[in-house]
Amino acid sequence: MIDDYEIALATPEDIPGIITLQDPNVIDRGGGLSVRQTADWFKRSMLEMPIVVGRRDGKVVGYVLSTSLAAKAHVAIVQAMLRTFPAPPDCYLYGPVCVAETERGRGLAQIMFEALRTRLPGRPAMTFIRADNAPSLQAHRKMGCKSSECL
């Protein structure tokens, strides 16, 4: 199944597909994503840090973000996380990860995560996952991520 995916750095041409995938997965629509990002945000973000996409038959079916701590320093949950867990040097924020419902359970999140780590070798990453986001918690456990504490 992993061979069914093209894993690549996102390009501006991927943004409409990323938005299409993001929108039904935001919290106010019953999904696990806490924040809805705009097309302009994705365009600016991909110039600063890698965004990895998974495509099947040319269609974006997953993505994972990386963001500098400075770019998210104004976000309350990030501020709380950094007060509780001071960031190590050269740390970046990882996530969110979004995978199309039809693709979940096939290892796509893990291969995108590994592709991102390859792009940022040796750099530590931090993320936060809402306690009620069971699918994300389970996926991250499978990927070997460790949980620290609840904020």
Task: Locate the predicted segments by residue.
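A short beta-loop-alpha structural element at the N-terminal edge
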Residues: 4-20, 31
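Glycine-rich acetyl-CoA-binding "A-motif" of GNAT/NAT acetyltransferases
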Residues: 59-62, 135
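Conserved acetyl-CoA-binding loop-helix of GNAT-fold acetyltransferases
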Residues: 95-101, 105-118, 142
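Conserved active-site alpha-helix within GNAT-family acetyltransferase domains
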Residues: 110, 131-150
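Conserved GNAT acetyl-CoA-binding A-motif
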Residues: 119-132
